[in-house]
Regions:
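Positively charged n-region of N-terminal signal peptides that target proteins for export
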Residues: 1-4
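Repetitive helical segments and hydrophobic/amphipathic motifs
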Residues: 11-12
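C-terminal motif of bacterial Sec signal peptides marking the signal peptidase cleavage site
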Residues: 15-17
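Short, low-complexity, disordered segments immediately C-terminal to signal peptides
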Residues: 19-34
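Basic, polyanion-binding surface patches
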Residues: 30-227
Length: 227
């Protein structure tokens, strides 16, 4: 009888310990979640938390052009884009008509919105090709089929990258740049001149587009005074 009571008591103690541990673990999880939601403030600065509007701003305004299933040109604006290596670019994309198109054709072109095309470029980001399949023609833009990939070149954008889809997984598009072409009007000594291209960037904090400014220093040169 005593052995039975001791056994029951031991089981109850174990259950109580487990309950206590679970309660403590839940408290720790809740505390960790609370800490993630409310990061410690940096002294002497305005702290914004993890507000997405300020992450990596300014952002590029890249225009992605594809053919749809009826061979109509489609263009959208994307801002979460960058260079992966010397021949590849990466763009973060959610589900769009553009993603359907590039998965079908395996190709796309990338151009850069500029001061001359602010309204048209913004329109391409506002309106889906699913709703307005002729949106490229609607703004008066024209296209030329790329000779290198199965995608259109938008003639009104003077700098274009012709890309082949390497992969598109979990919203991350990786493209191989097979050719870059530029209109003579934006070149100086045979090189792309940003003062002539006049690309714009997206200011996510102010929700506006901004022009790039003047050169403020020579790359791999301005810092040599500290060597």
């Amino acid at each position: 009888m005593k052995k039975g009571l001791f056994s029951i008591a031991a089981v109850l103690l174990v259950l109580a310990a487990c309950t206590s541990n679970n309660h403590q673990n839940n408290q720790n999880v809740n505390e960790n979640m609370k800490n993630k939601e409310q990061p410690q403030e940096v002294t002497g600065r305005k702290n914004f938390g993890s507000s997405h509007a300020l992450v990596t701003t300014p952002q590029p305004c890249v225009m992605i052009a594809t053919w749809d299933k009826d061979h109509n040109p489609d263009v959208m604006m994307a801002a979460w884009a960058g260079q992966l290596d010397y021949k590849q670019i990466v763009i973060s994309l959610s589900k769009h008509k553009t993603t359907d198109n590039l998965e079908q054709t395996g190709a796309f072109t990338v151009s850069f919105a500029d001061e001359r095309t602010v309204a048209e470029s913004d329109y391409f980001g506002l309106v889906s090709g699913n709703d307005v399949p002729d949106k490229v023609a609607r703004v008066g833009f024209t296209v030329t089929p790329s000779p290198n990939v199965d995608a259109p070149i938008i003639n009104e954008y003077p700098l274009t990258l012709e890309c082949r889809v390497v992969s598109f997984e979990d919203g991350m598009l990786i493209g191989e740049v097979v050719n870059q072409s530029a209109d003579e009007s934006i070149l100086t000594d045979g090189k792309v001149d940003l003062t002539k291209l006049k690309p714009i960037v997206f200011d996510a904090a102010a929700m506006c587009y901004r022009a790039l400014g003047d050169s403020v220093g020579q790359a791999w040169g301005a810092g040599k005074k500290f060597q």
